[in-house]
Amino acid sequence: MYPAFTVAEVRRAEQLELDRLGEDVLMRRAARGLATVVLEELRRSAGRVYGNRVLLVVGSGNNGGDGLWAGVTLARRGVRVSAWRTGSAVHAAGWAAFLAAGGRELDAAGALAELSRAAVVVDAVTGLGGRAGLRPEVAGFAAACATRRVPVVAVDLPSGIPADPPFVVPAPAHFPATTTVSFGGRKLCQAIEPARSACGRLVLVDIGLGTMTPEVVCWEPADVLAHWPVPGPSDDKYSRGVVGIDAGSASYPGAGVLATTGAVRAGAGMVRFVGVPEVAATVVERLPNVVAAPGRVQSLVLGSGWGRRPDGARIVAAAIDGGLPVVLDADALTLLPEVLHADVLLTPHAGELARLLDVPREQITADPVAAARQAVAQTGATVLLKGASQVVATPGHEAVELAVPGPAWTAQAGSGDLLAGICGALLAAGLPVRLAAVLAASAQALAAARQGGVPPQELDLQAALG
């Protein structure tokens, strides 16, 4: 797992070091790390360092200073370095050192002309305080970088992308980072979509900041392997966990099949299908190891593909009152009682959560972490917000967790039904709700990634999981 931090938290940690060491020490550390990455990029993309051209695009703040001091190091290594100052001001000491090292100043027109010869562009325009979008002149240059496919190394973050949410969809004008060099730790824009993809390859540079409190904790594939429940030699089907599933309807029978398949392939010891008879017949035909009869269970999955269910509210209320961990998906999310608890797992996508919170859908996608937290505060339940970044928020836990990211191919009908079943299986195995949610979303993402660059069908995902 790795943490990601807000701008405020990074600045707090930076200020402690600035007070202790001064600005120059931190900036030189950052510049050395940045120069190392640019040199690596030159070797990778151009095959050599000496004599190649690097174009710095620098703003007025410390971000620009980092770029200029890195330019000094590059010039001393034989790189032909030029710089375009995008504003009226510039970091004075860095600019003087850059010129003294043989760096060349360009205006906007000169920078565009130099772009055809540059092996690497360093984006040092804005830093942590940057807003979404770029001034027209800079936006035009950034677009030219994308058109000409010049490698771009961004300093801390791609200019035009804010460090903290909200993240606008589609993204405003920004530099197309091939690589982003982040100082002191990951920022939220480097962990949460759609900003994450705009950052390209991420390289972390340690500049000696102290302990910081993360806003989100991001899961990695190794974490899934470490936490996945594995049966022991004395386990049987009951001790592995029995999950009860009521999903699907005459109009949407496939939802029942998919939710049940997810639970089976995720390793449930037994799956009881307790939904409507017309769906039960289809489920048992596809999955003969499923028991289509009521009985004791350790978790419940409700709502996927229900449509309008006259007895739905009663079923949901009874499940919540029963004290078992419950997954509420899709149509069950419209039938919530006033009182929920942390063992209830809500699995909305952005549209469903927008309706639940009575806010525009765009507000959910722009800041999924805040949206998931708001849902927890409003309902008292644990929330798995599905989407490009899958967010798990839990009552009593300050940090939000992000599942392992997966390919965009998983954005297809049926993914949520499948995920609900996986969640149910992990809950039946005895995992805490928070852990089951992030494990399930991560496992689905990893299974999709194994399918390669083609649109996976949901049963293919389950074949990969199995």
Where are these regions (language model features)?
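Small-residue (G/A/S/T)-rich helix-start motifs and N-terminal tracts that mark the onset
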Residues: 1-85, 179, 185-330, 334-345, ...
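Generic hydrophobic alpha-helical membrane-segment signal
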Residues: 2, 90, 107, 111, ...
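Short, conserved loop/turn and helix-capping segments at secondary-structure boundaries
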Residues: 92, 139, 171-174, 366, ...
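Internal gly/pro-rich beta-alpha loop/helix module
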Residues: 119-120, 125-216
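A short, aliphatic-rich alpha-helical micro-motif
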Residues: 115-119, 174, 294-295, 320
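Nucleotide and nucleotide-moiety/phosphate-recognizing core
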Residues: 36-125, 133-155, 315
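Short strand->helix junction
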Residues: 88, 128-131, 162, 168, ...
